[in-house]
Amino acid sequence: MEDNITSIVIDCGSGMCKAGIGGEEFPRVSFPSIVGKPRFEKTMCAIGNKEYYVGDEAQSQRGMLSLKYPIKNGIVVNWEYMEKLLFHMFYNELRVSPDQYPILFTESPLNPKSNREMLTQIMFEKFNVPALYIAIQAVLSLYASGRTCGIVLDSGDDVTHTVPIYGGYVLQHSIIRLNFAGSDLTEYMAKLLLERGYSFTTTSEMEIVKSIKEKLAYVAINFNAEMSKPIDTLETTYQLPDGQIIIIGNERFRCAEALFQPSMIGLECDGIHETIFKSIMMCDIDIRKHMYANILLSGGNTMLSGISDRIYNQLRELAPNNMKILIVASPERKNLVWIGGSILTTLPLFQEMWISKEEYDEHGPSIINKKVGLY
């Protein structure tokens, strides 16, 4: 690979793993965070005699594999499979030798210290990296927008967080986590389409539903007003991979409405607007105005059309009358965490934050907890 690589930035979420070169604009690779093992020995022969498959390859062979998701709700739950995912990412996707470059990893807010230490141990002992840093995803999103204060609504595949940050520091006591995100909307869309007579049940069919959601779903500015519109004004068509054309109507915004009314899918939790409001109210009274004026959307699940206007309207009803509210919705918010990490690795002040192999050898995995959180 090129000689001008200074560092590698890795953002692994529950749904997708993104990786690339520090200082570049976008991640070079992105693949599903899944690992598959052949169900039977005969299957191994049929699909190439591999012990396991990762990412897109696992997705394409899923009928013959037992699929595992190493990351659940933003937290690594299976380290054996996480190692396989990382090996695949370095050697098959990025095609780099990890012992040559410092590695910046992103992590979910509220990630247990023990998990952080385990990742540190794996990176130094299994992959022999020369240096490592682990940064909190929401902070990186904020950096990518040129801010050090604000509240980040980060919603990906299966977890949503509201994370207040002030002066670059995460306000841990004000974080709220919802185990509810994009995959829940995909399942709800499948249920709504079933009511229309279209059945999607298999893993591959659910990928089609995900594509329908990403292309056609939107957030209604006013849900009741949208529901009262004539049906034919809402309907559009979608061509399935087999050529069949289906009609989709109010499912497009009913699906996304679950973000604001989780009870629609049977969840007893607050909507995203209420979660933002509660997170802000848990902050010190003197900094709440900074939070309201810097509400940053991050993650693939915030890419829905109309979401920022709807959040603004809902918060306008909850916030004090004279409060300035600003929703920041970057067109790149799907990759905002990775972009923030890429920016961070280029800052001169950050270079002293890397944890070196020498430091690790001297202090062990706990060294990571002494430095993480400063950026």
UniProtKB/Swiss-Prot annotation:
One of its GO terms (biological process) is phagocytosis. Pfam families: Actin (PF00022). SMART domains: ACTIN (SM00268). GO terms for molecular function: ATP binding; hydrolase activity; myosin binding; structural constituent of cytoskeleton. Its main location: cytoplasm. It comes from the Eukaryota. It catalyses: ATP + H2O = ADP + phosphate + H(+). Its EC number is 3.6.4.-. Keywords: ATP-binding, Cytoplasm, Cytoskeleton, Hydrolase, Nucleotide-binding. One of its GO terms (cellular component) is cytoplasm. SUPFAM superfamilies: Actin-like ATPase domain (SSF53067). It is found in: Cytoplasm, Cytoskeleton. Signal peptide: none annotated. Actins are highly conserved proteins that are involved in various types of cell motility and are ubiquitously expressed in all eukaryotic cells. Multiple isoforms are involved in various cellular functions such as cytoskeleton structure, cell mobility, chromosome movement and muscle contraction. Belongs to the actin family. This is Putative actin-26. It comes from Dictyostelium discoideum.
